[in-house]
A protein has these predicted regions:
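Membrane/wall-proximal cationic-aromatic binding patches
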Residues: 37-129, 255-270, 364-383, 420
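Serine-dependent acyl-ester chemistry module
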Residues: 112, 170-355, 360-370, 382, ...
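Histidine-centered active-site loop/cap adjacent to the catalytic His
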Residues: 18, 356, 380-420
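Generic structural signal for small/hydrophobic residues in well-ordered secondary structure
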Residues: 31, 100, 148, 164, ...
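Conserved SGNH/GDSL esterase-like catalytic core that processes O-acyl groups on lipids
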Residues: 69-73, 85, 90, 94-96, ...
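Solvent-exposed, polar/charged alpha-helical surfaces in well-ordered, non-transmembrane soluble domains
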Residues: 116, 120, 150, 154, ...
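Solvent-exposed, acidic/flexible segments
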Residues: 95, 107-111, 141, 145, ...
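N-terminal secretory targeting modules
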Residues: 1-94, 109, 158-162, 174-178, ...
């Protein structure tokens, strides 16, 4: 190589290093600036899961800023909870709570979620004896009753719970148990089907590379990198906004309107009120039948482990609307006889099978009207929308503590009588 060529190479290398350094410095300044400005974006704590379709990623952490502002830290077992030992230590009484996003409660700080509040109050009251009480949060956003049954069978028992609480949400739990109704993730979850009166598991969702362990790990690493960078979060947020606007423009340009039909897949906008009505389409009939069969199966599962089951119904938003006029207008618009249809049906079915039920719509709406505050919604969302806020979680905790203490007292009395 001639001296002239060598000089050009060194000059090119210097320029390249200068460009790279300038780019790095610019990105670093942007990152620092965004952090100083307090920029946050709701990060991902999810992972693909070959058992459930999806679950929370062990060790992940991220902000939630779409509803409320809260920090989510996932423990080493993959739940939004503090670290728990498996198996259960001696001298501990455990309550395991199965549920969806209402139980996961990423919209509020962990110590303000109802599972943490219940644990604190039960230890203060000592209604479960002198043992230390732990209330384990197994909530995973978006799951249905079938996934909760699988979770209980395969992953919860190793924690040796003494009682199981199944949180049921009328707004979408029935939909999530049927592929045609589960519009958010129809092909990403396992489903139970009723055939000749028996539940059969459909696991066809596992096709493709999405559930390959290496792929899951790489996706988790990329999500962790995204969660740790304000700049990457901003880029992702802008790309999502652009995609959403493109989709809205496409739908607007189509100029189509839809109405309820007797098909198996009603339009998503009508699913908002379908759970308040008796099933009138085949998919809803099937979804309710599967849901009720799953409740029976959950009861069999808990009974075989000598752990009592309590079903706790979290109401949908319109059930806890504090303004009676708004509530009545909604009922009239969609010809709803009772906003309590789903909760009524679940309670009847559960009690017919010897399962106690805790219903929360009445105490939540009474508290909202008594205090003049909403039990759902946050400063960055419309009032009475989305998920329960801290006030709502406090009411849930109060009622759940009462129910658990009643069950514990009944079992203690029965045990005492059996000894005599």
């Amino acid at each position: 190589m001639s001296m002239k060529s060598a000089f050009r190479m060194r000059n090119f290398a210097k320029k390249l290093l200068l460009i790279l350094f300038s780019a790095f410095l610019g990105l670093a300044i942007c990152e620092i600036g965004l952090r100083l400005l307090g920029f946050k974006y709701s990060g991902s704590t999810w992972r693909n899961d070959p058992l459930l379709g999806w679950s929370l990623r062990p060790g992940a952490s991220a902000w939630e800023v779409d509803e409320g502002v809260a920090w989510s830290k996932i423990n080493s077992h993959g739940y939004r909870d503090r670290e728990r030992a498996a198996p259960k230590p001696q001298g501990v009484y455990r309550v395991a709570v199965l549920g969806d996003s209402c139980t996961e409660a990423r919209q509020v700080d962990r110590d303000k979620g109802f599972t943490s509040l219940v644990e604190e109050e039960l230890n203060r009251r000592h209604c479960c004896g002198e043992r230390q009480v732990e209330v384990l949060n197994f909530g995973i956003g978006g799951v249905g009753t079938g996934q909760e049954l699988l979770l209980l069978r395969e992953r919860v028992w190793k924690f040796n719970p003494d009682m199981i609480v199944l949180q049921f949400y009328a707004g979408n739990d029935v939909f999530n148990n049927h592929r045609a109704l589960n519009t958010s993730s129809p092909d990403k979850a396992p489903y139970f089907l009723l055939r000749n009166g028996k539940l059969e598991l459909d696991e066809s969702f596992r096709q493709g590379r999405a559930f390959d362990p290496t792929y899951i790990k790489l996706k988790g690493v990329s999500a962790d990198i995204m969660n740790s960078s304000a700049l990457l979060q901003l880029v992702y947020k802008l790309s999502r906004l652009y995609a959403q606007r493109q989709e809205m423009a496409r739908l607007s340009g189509a100029g189509q309107t839809v109405a309820p039909s007797d098909t198996d897949a009603p339009p998503p906008e009508y699913q908002r009120y379908l759970s308040y009505l008796p099933p009138a389409i085949p998919s809803m009939v099937e979804a309710w039948q599967v849901t009720e069969a799953l409740i029976v199966e959950l009861n069999k599962e808990t009974s075989s482990h000598h752990a009592p089951l309590l079903i706790m119904t979290i109401p949908a938003i319109h059930q806890i609307q504090p303004n009676p006029k708004i509530q009545e207008a909604y009922r009239a618009k969609y010809k709803i006889e009772s906003l309590e249809y789903a909760d009524d049906r679940v309670e009847r079915h559960a009690r017919a099978n010897g399962i106690p039920v805790l219903r929360l719509s009445k105490p939540l709406v009474e508290e909202a009207r008594r205090t003049g505050t909403y039990m759902a919604g946050f400063a960055n969302t419309p009032p009475n929308s989305g998920h329960l806020n801290e006030r709502g979680h406090a009411v849930v905790a109060r009622e759940l503590v009462r129910a658990i203490c009643e069950i514990a007292a009944t079992r203690a009395a029965a045990k005492s009588l059996s000894k005599n």
